[in-house]
Amino acid sequence: MSMFLKTIEIKGFKSFADKTELIFTGGITSIVGPNGSGKSNISDAVRWVLGEQSVKTLRGGKMEDVIFAGTQFRKPLGLCQVSLTLDNEDKKLSLEYSNITVSRRLYRSGESEYYINNVQCRLRDIHELFMDTGIGREGYSIIGQGRIDALLSGKQEDRRLLLEEAAGIVKFRWRRSEAEKKLENTEVNLIRIEDILHTYEERLKPLELENKKADEFLRLSEELKDKEKTVLIYSLKKIQHKIDKLESSMERITSSNRESHLELTKLREDVNGYNIRMENIMDESTRCEKDYYDKRELINQGENKIKLLKQKIEDLEDNIKRNYLELKQIENDKIKKSEGITLQNQNLLELKNREKEVNIGILDYENNIKKIEKDIYSRENICKKLKEDKIQYFSNISKLRNHIISIKKDGENIVEKIDKLKSSYESYSKAIIISSEKKNKLLGEISNIKKNISVYQNKIDENNSGILELTNVLNLKENSLQKLNALYNTLEANYKMLVNFHKHYEGYNRTVKALMENIKNHKLDVPAQSCFLVGEIISLQKKFETCIEISLGNSISSVITNNEIIAKIIIKYLKDNKMGRATFLPISIIKGRKISNLHKFEDIKGFIGVASELVSYSKEFKDVLDYILGRTIICENIDNAFEIAKLAEYSFKIVTLSGDVVNSGGAITGGSLQKRSSNIIGRKREIEETLVKIENTKETLQVLNGDIRRIKSDKEKLHCQNEDFKEKIHLDNIELTKLHQQNDTIERETKKLIESRETANREIKLLYKNKEVNLNELQEEEKKLKEYSKEEIKNDDYILKMEEELKEGRNRITDLKEGLTSLKVKRAQISENILSSERELSRLDQEIKSMDIKNRSIVEEIKLSEKIIHKNELNMYSNEKEVKDLKQYMEKLQESIEKSHVKTIELKQKINVSNEKVDNLTLIINKKETSFHKIQLELTKLNSQKDNIYSRLKEDMNITCDGDIEYDVQIENLEEYKSKIVHLKSSISKLGVVNLGAIEEYKNLQKKITFLSSQKEDLIKSKQELKKVIDAMTEKMKGVFKENFVKLKKNFNDTFRELFKGGSADLVLTKGDELTGNIDITVQPPGKKLQNINLMSGGEKGLSAIALLFAMLKIKPTPFCILDEIEASLDDANVLRYAEFLRKFSRDTQFIVITHRKGTMEVSDVLYGVTMEEKGVSKIISLKL
């Protein structure tokens, strides 16, 4: 059999949340299901796995939309995967596999992966694999309703792609396209190389000149360097001779100056002594003078204060006299102001009484005006309302007259409609009786089938409950099995690890570990049973492991021997092999140690026991264990340990359960314990416990495996029963569907008839009501018309009466407002007089208050002045006494100052003599130092010249030390030698700017030009060969397309005539050659004129497109073809023709058809149903026909 699609596996793609597999055989497979169930998601999945990149084609907004997005009860998935498996026994695809599986995987992050037979590949590899097979996103193996429309009326490019796929030139076009790309790249590379070559060749000539100049520059530079080197060494030799002479002179000056400096130092010390004594005398003199002047200043200040105080006393006495006179004047002014206040109060009372009378008159006027204005406002509103009513009456009367005419006309129309509807009602009633009889018969048949389905479904539900229960139990058992297996593996690994640790002495120090291994392997001439490790011979409860291990310390690695002879042999072996040191405990000589008066500690809270008594061991090791642990007590905590230690006077070790230690002598060890990688003491216990756990786990695993096998067997039986019941239900459902369709048709017809009859009946009743309403409305409207006419006359009379009353009221208001204005003017005048009188009262009152305040202020001022006079008199007496004392003290200071002046003159004479000697000696020293500095400067200058020469020798000649310099250089004529150097420099200068890199650059450029010239020749040859390939490929494509296009035209005409039972169809190549021209479709259905396909009806278009599809399949059958509801627009007769063609073509092509149509289902070999038992999640049900 030729290649065909074996399976589609979908997981997480769109609505297929669970892993779903569709298995296909040859022939026709139909996929059916209600709208929205996810049928088309299967064709989208195939299109997607074949490399579709258009999100729009996949009916999404972005590529991640194809991943299952979750439902109310399910979480979104992180990836989706689709796999197609094809049978490739005939090796139609270019891979050496019988089955080829193509897969695509997409992650929610946007990352996409492609696989061929589970090997990751590129999208391009998948396109190349299916090229010219009709399979692929651009092929015609997947045709949907949208693709049908594109085939007929879409872009010319899309149509040509499909027809070229059928004509078998896609592979050639792809190869030509690849060759064109290579040619384009070759041309670009050729242009690039030519540009680079041109640039290099332009650069080569100037670079050749620069290369020659650089060579000349290097030759002259080398000669100049040699001559400059000779001159520099010769100069260095002469400079060194001068330096030696100058250094000798410096040593002589330094020696002479040293003696002069000693003498100068002694003279300066004498001068300093005189200066210090003189400074002390002068300091004392200065202090006395300062004190003298300070006291004189104080006397002046005291005398000034006395004068000032006398003046202040006189001023204050004058001020008191003036204040008394001012008090008397204030009292007289106050009496006059009080009399003015009394007069103003009388005037103010009279004005307020007159103002009250005027206010009462104004209030009466205002009340009368408000009352009349209110009445006028009310009448104006009534008048306005009456006028509005008049307009409304006129409008209502006009409307009523028009409405009455309309009502009479409506009544006549209602009578005509009632007669027509009565006739229709009787016709509908007869048709309903006939439909009801048909429906009753069908319902009986449907009821019987439903009962059968219900029985089968109940049995399936019972089985499903059983399956679910078994599945839950199975899941629990399998989870338990998985956990137990993991536990078993962990226990086994732990057991092996512990045994391995025990076997290889893991946890002991390196020396002991190696020693015991060698003893066990008989590398040491010692019996294996004569040596034991302390950590191996003891066993104990788990709770004591930490404290005993801490108690043992390094002793845990001690080696127990039967006697001291074995210990000596082992020690010698360790020394000879340089294996390190170990501690040995010979049983024959070791003596145990005990705690005396142990009973004293046993009653203390927290005491547990002696460490040696808490472990188990063989009797032969008792002395050894007593030696190690006999003087160690174990207690519960650190507080207990301190209590025991104090009582025992810190004479032995105490260890707590948590590992804290109080050592003998008082040292304390404690804190957190690091996790132990190897528990030596508890290892035996751990091995035994782990072995028991392994055995128990094995037994449990055997029981669980037996339970799982039994549950799976029971579950399989229930599944088989369910499949039988489902098969029966499926057959009944097909029959039930047919009956339901018939019943639905009858119900729809009956419903329409009933609705039509009810509509007619409702309309009749409504018309009768309308007729009655019409009559009542007519009578009411005529009655309203009479009433409105009467009301209109009354309204006009009332308006006239209101307007006369309004006129009278307005005249009355005018008279009252004139009287009110007169009174308000009078009130304003009185108010002004009152305000003026109040201001005068306020002014007088304020002046009296100010006088009172001033009076109090003057009295206070007099009292204060009297106090100040008394205080100043006291200060004046005190200052006079102080001035007298200061004058006596000043006389004593004057005597001390005169004595200090005499002593200062004597010391200055001595200092002048010594300073003269210092100056003479300093002059001599300075002259010597000046000579010394001159020599130093000359030396510095010479050394600098010397360093410069060394620097030049180092930098220019690469001479780095004196050893490299040959000082025997001789120059007969230095000036002539320097002249040659100047000539060389001039020659170098004439060369101008020199590019030393040009030498290397010139060589490299020559190499590059040679290489690029070779590359250019290769590219020209490649370009010519590619052009030949493209021309040959183009001719091949034209030939193949032309040949197959003729066949395709014939096939299209034949299939069109078969499907339409006559007519004709053609494919026409226009505007260009075979590879670029447009391809138009022209058709002529039977009995119609020849026309463009775009002018046909939807059904005709659909059938024409199907004809073209089958024509393409005739010329080049695809291994499989997926058709997604392409017959949707066809009527039942054309669906049958389409189905016949499917059956006919299914001999060469495998068809997977997504359909709703009964005719297509009937020719199918296998039916797959797509349902959504869970909202948002598609599920597949299969049925082989």
Curated annotation (Swiss-Prot):
Localization per Swiss-Prot or TrEMBL: Cytoplasm
Signal peptide boundaries: none
One cellular component (GO) term of this entry: cytoplasm
Coiled coil: 174-376, 412-526, 679-1039
SMC hinge domain mapped to chain residues: 534-644
Database matches in Pfam families: SMC_hinge, SMC_N
CDD domains, per database record: ABC_SMC_barmotin
Main location: cytoplasm
UniProt cross-references to InterPro entries, sorted A to Z: P-loop_NTPase, RecF/RecN/SMC_N, SMC, SMC_hinge, SMC_hinge_sf, SMC_prok
Protein keywords: ATP-binding, Coiled coil, Cytoplasm, DNA-binding, Nucleotide-binding
GO BP term (any one): DNA replication
Binding site for ATP: 34-41
Molecular-function annotations in GO: ATP binding; ATP hydrolysis activity; DNA binding
Family statement: Belongs to the SMC family.
Function description: Required for chromosome condensation and partitioning.
PANTHER family in UniProt: STRUCTURAL MAINTENANCE OF CHROMOSOMES PROTEIN 3 (PTHR43977)
Quaternary structure note: Homodimer.
Domain remark in the UniProt entry: Contains large globular domains required for ATP hydrolysis at each terminus and a third globular domain forming a flexible SMC hinge near the middle of the molecule. These domains are separated by coiled-coil structures.
Protein name: Chromosome partition protein Smc
Protein species of origin: Clostridium kluyveri (strain NBRC 12016)
Lineage: Bacteria, Bacillati, Bacillota, Clostridia, Eubacteriales
